[in-house]
Swiss-Prot record:
Key words of the record: 4Fe-4S, Cell inner membrane, Cell membrane, Electron transport, Iron, Iron-sulfur, Membrane, Metal-binding, Repeat, Translocase, Transport
Positions of the 4Fe-4S ferredoxin-type domain: 369-397, 407-436
GO biological process: electron transport chain
Binding site for [4Fe-4S] cluster 2: C387, C416, C419, C422
Protein name as catalogued: Ion-translocating oxidoreductase complex subunit C
Domain of life: Bacteria
Entry GO terms, CC: plasma membrane
Enzyme class: translocase
Biased composition (Low complexity): 605-615
Cofactor binding notes: Binds 2 [4Fe-4S] clusters per subunit.
Cofactor(s) this protein requires: [4Fe-4S] cluster
Amino acid sequence: MLKLFSAFRKNKIWDFNGGIHPPEMKTQSNGTPLRQVPLAQRFVIPLKQHIGAEGELCVSVGDKVLRGQPLTRGRGKMLPVHAPTSGTVTAIAPHSTAHPSALAELSVIIDADGEDCWIPRDGWADYRSRRREELIERIHQFGVAGLGGAGFPTGVKLQGGGDKIETLIINAAECEPYITADDRLMQDCAAQVVEGIRILAHILQPREILIGIEDNKPQAISMLRAVLADSHDISMRVIPTKYPSGGAKQLTYILTGKQVPHGGRSSDIGVLMQNVGTAYAVKRAVIDGEPITERVVTLTGEAIARPGNVWARLGTPVRHLLNDAGFCPSADQMVIMGGPLMGFTLPWLDVPVVKITNCLLAPSANELGEPQEEQSCIRCSACADACPADLLPQQLYWFSKGQQHDKATTHNIADCIECGACAWVCPSNIPLVQYFRQEKAEIAAIRQEEKRAAEAKARFEARQARLEREKAARLERHKSAAVQPAAKDKDAIAAALARVKEKQAQATQPIVIKAGERPDNSAIIAAREARKAQARAKQAELQQTNDAATVTDPRKTAVEAAIARAKARKLEQQQANAEPEQQVDPRKAAVEAAIARAKARKLEQQQANAEPEQQVDPRKAAVEAAIARAKARKLEQQQANAEPEEPVDPRKAAVEAAIARAKARKLEQQQANAEPEEPVDPRKAAVEAAITRAKARKLEQQQANAEPEEQVDPRKAAVAAAIARAKARKLEQQQANAEPEEQVDPRKAAVAAAIARVQAKKAVQQKVVNED
């Protein structure tokens, strides 16, 4: 029955899996009271001493500052920092900070003036009359953050808790070896700590308030019990010493039996936890009106002559604190910020004290032993047995070493609290915590990159959607403009329609013929004449364009002319020395002669008016002339053996000559008034003219030496000649009075004229013969 009653007691505690019991080593520093350290000459205050973004600077180089004066502005989750003493801002530049890699962060450097003057302080002793929001804002603006090691802004944490917090836990376990800052603070300032707890309770209004403290702090337990003797709203739970019972999840389970869900927060189960040092800082911010400018720091280790706990101003160089405590470094001396399990080694001693600095450990060479070489994992599972978060450190080790980020995430590497228990028990001396920290950093970087990529994709898709909307709107405007033409377009369309209707009305209007009157066709005749004139003008322009475009090559013309002359000479020689066996057709000869003369005249006119485009190469012209002469000689030899064609009827020749003369006169008149339709190639004209002249000479010789085989009827010849002359006169009269509607081909006209002249001459000759 007694055991059953004990099980239902209110102060029941639970135990978590894993954990270790390393040597505590706390007696080196917890036996002496808190003391002040002399001010340093220079303070380095990093702008970021908490989780989250740094604040906005509100001072500049050369400014005079007082203790407690804000150096940055805190907006949102940004936490401000304050001047630790009065002095002058000498620089604002990057400086190495309290970090395992000693990364340089933007810092404000202040040279102290030694006066240590405060800003005007306005404390709220009657904080119970203040609203919850006012208290949270004051805590935030006074720079209060979690002093247990996380550095999370306290005001943000209180704001996030809201009205769902049922249990407020004050973490006083301080389980890591060597560290006694909270122990000494509770011994020397227990009343102030409890007052800070009451301010937090006033803000959160929880149903219960629990203080968790390990049983290895008897003096602190005594002081708290004395202060809480008359208080019934705050319960203190003394728990067994076990590392890491001071972890947030572990202490929550020990005191409440509730487990924080994976990936969640303690506020999800109605629990909010604050550190003892944080409660003390809340009291000083609200009641005393003092921003956080200092904190308790444990100085311990066998390399320090006077170990203990001191009030260290934020921004004080570590070297200054160690020298004040009698630091005696060895050849290979190391200094650890934090405890031996969760702390990190400082690369040098010029880094400043920040809000999360709770211990400076300077061990001797024999105190921690010689560092041993890392060996291969033997899969003994000792790390898994010691893990307080129920993880598999050996598997996480392999995943971290193999860059298998997905598997490490699946095995809940984010739940690792980096307590170092696994590395403490590892027989292979594997620094597991270092591997886990590196893996967490890489996963965080990957997620940050994925987040930026997702944001960039969202911006791109939004831009594409905007462009599509603009394009659709533009197309819609174009469609509207096409459907509804503008006023000017409407006027132009109406004017065009009116002109079309007017033309149609004029075209369909009938011509009325009245009795005794003649119809007036003058308008129609004038329109016809205008169209003819327009057509002739267009044809003249086209002819001028063609004449300008036609270019005669003088070299080819010269060659062809030479060939024609050679052929003509050869033909003359043949006619002079040879007796024709047959009569030559005089009609064909006359026609060809007339054609040749017409072409020759036209060629002379074109050559007189045309400018050659390019100079003739005399060498090429000489070569071509020689070739032409050779061809002419060969032609003479070939024609020496040729026979003439059949005899010609003189009657038909006379008629054709008369017709040719009439047509020639008509052609001359047309050429005087009209422009030729097409340009004649002068080269071909010259060749044909030469050939025609040769043939004409040959024909004359044949006619002079030949006797006609048949007698021509003189009456018929006279009648034909008279008819030809009458037709010629009639044709001349028609050409003199009429305007030609179409252009006449000059070559055909020349041929017809030549034929007419030959026929006329022949008819006259026949008439003379008949009269004789």
